[in-house]
Amino acid sequence: MARALLKFIRVSPIKSRLIAREIQGMNAELALASLEFTPNKAAKIIAKVVASAVANSGNEAADCIVTSCRVDNGPVLKRFRPRARGMASGIRKPTAHILVEVEGK
């Protein structure tokens, strides 16, 4: 079993989990093909992590299965936006930690 971890990535964990659940249990080659055509920022990032996990395993992508794809919450960057009459409102910029585990056949 090989794994790849990408931490503190500037993408929403909630939106990333939707993509991560789709590829769990898939063949790594099919998962990469599926992620390539998914129009989502998180899909491009998760595809890189899956490719890294496959490279760490030392096997070909066709011989690997994505056993686990987990997206955890990272720290939230807090910013402020100036508003009318001297006020300010908050902006939350979430980060995520992405863990992908693959296993050879």
Swiss-Prot record:
GO terms for molecular function: rRNA binding; structural constituent of ribosome. GO terms for biological process: translation. Keywords: Ribonucleoprotein, Ribosomal protein, RNA-binding, rRNA-binding. InterPro entries: Ribosomal_uL22 (IPR001063), Ribosomal_uL22_bac/chlpt-type (IPR005727), Ribosomal_uL22_bac/org-type (IPR047867), Ribosomal_uL22_sf (IPR036394). Belongs to the universal ribosomal protein uL22 family. This protein binds specifically to 23S rRNA; its binding is stimulated by other ribosomal proteins, e.g. L4, L17, and L20. It is important during the early stages of 50S assembly. It makes multiple contacts with different domains of the 23S rRNA in the assembled 50S subunit and ribosome. NCBIfam families: rplV_bact. This is Large ribosomal subunit protein uL22. It comes from Sulfurimonas denitrificans (strain ATCC 33889 / DSM 1251). The lineage of its organism: Bacteria, Pseudomonadati, Campylobacterota, Epsilonproteobacteria, Campylobacterales. The gene is rplV.
